[in-house]
């Protein structure tokens, strides 16, 4: 049941990305979340540990959820003792909003912020895509597309080529196979070939030893290598 599996992964990823202080407000009790206690905390900048108003700083960014509306504006839970005010604006109850702290006193005042303006990593956005992989790649117009496969070329053989495209790319897709099928099989079932829809097919786990690698393990291993090879090297 791929639809149910997509929905499960979607809600688990959304739950993990949500700051801990907002989870009870934004997620109702449901069976899919019964084991979320074993999920590792992200410890990203938008998951602050501070719960005290006195420790907030002007200019700090926070994620908030609307708790009520007043004549003055909208009150938000931003993870401290009392709600913060965003003046002269009204938002639906429970809507999640990114804000910037502009005043700290008896009441914290905030302004609406675009998460793209935050100078730190501010979490991820989840999109459930129902198109087949090949159609997704072709329709989105990614600047760089990389497929991972044990049948791909060693990453070391194409490092320079990928680096050149990586420098100029604003949107990058990294594709992984499913637990029961690799990307070669998936694209063959779609009536096309993997090489025809992506720029590179690479093996990020050479000499893996096992017949298959779990998708979640391949994600960690591959993204760590790509980050080290390209993001860090290019910044230098």
Each predicted region: which residue ranges?
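Post-transcriptional modification and biogenesis factors for structured RNAs
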Residues: 1-236
């Amino acid at each position: 049941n791929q639809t149910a599996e997509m929905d499960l992964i979607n809600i688990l990823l959304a739950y993990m990305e949500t700051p801990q202080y907002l989870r009870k407000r934004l997620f109702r009790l449901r069976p899919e979340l019964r084991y979320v206690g074993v999920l590792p905390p992200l410890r990203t900048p938008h998951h602050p540990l501070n719960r005290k108003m006195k420790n907030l700083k002007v200019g700090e960014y926070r994620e908030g959820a609307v708790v009520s509306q007043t004549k003055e504006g909208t009150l938000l839970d931003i993870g401290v003792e009392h709600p913060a005010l965003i003046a002269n604006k009204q938002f639906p109850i429970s809507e999640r909003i990114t804000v910037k702290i502009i005043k700290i006193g008896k009441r914290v005042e905030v302004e609406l912020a675009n998460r793209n303006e935050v100078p730190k990593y501010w979490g991820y956005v989840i999109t459930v895509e129902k198109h087949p992989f090949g159609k997704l790649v072709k329709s989105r117009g990614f600047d760089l597309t990389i497929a991972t496969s044990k049948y791909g070329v060693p990453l070391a053989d194409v490092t320079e080529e990928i680096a050149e495209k990586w420098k100029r790319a604003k949107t990058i897709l990294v594709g992984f196979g499913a637990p029961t099928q690799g990307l070669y099989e998936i694209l063959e079932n779609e009536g096309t070939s993997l090489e025809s829809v992506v720029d590179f097919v690479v093996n990020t786990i050479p000499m893996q030893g096992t017949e298959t690698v779990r998708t979640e393990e391949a994600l960690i291993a591959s993204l760590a290598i790509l980050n080290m090879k390209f993001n860090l090297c290019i910044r230098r």
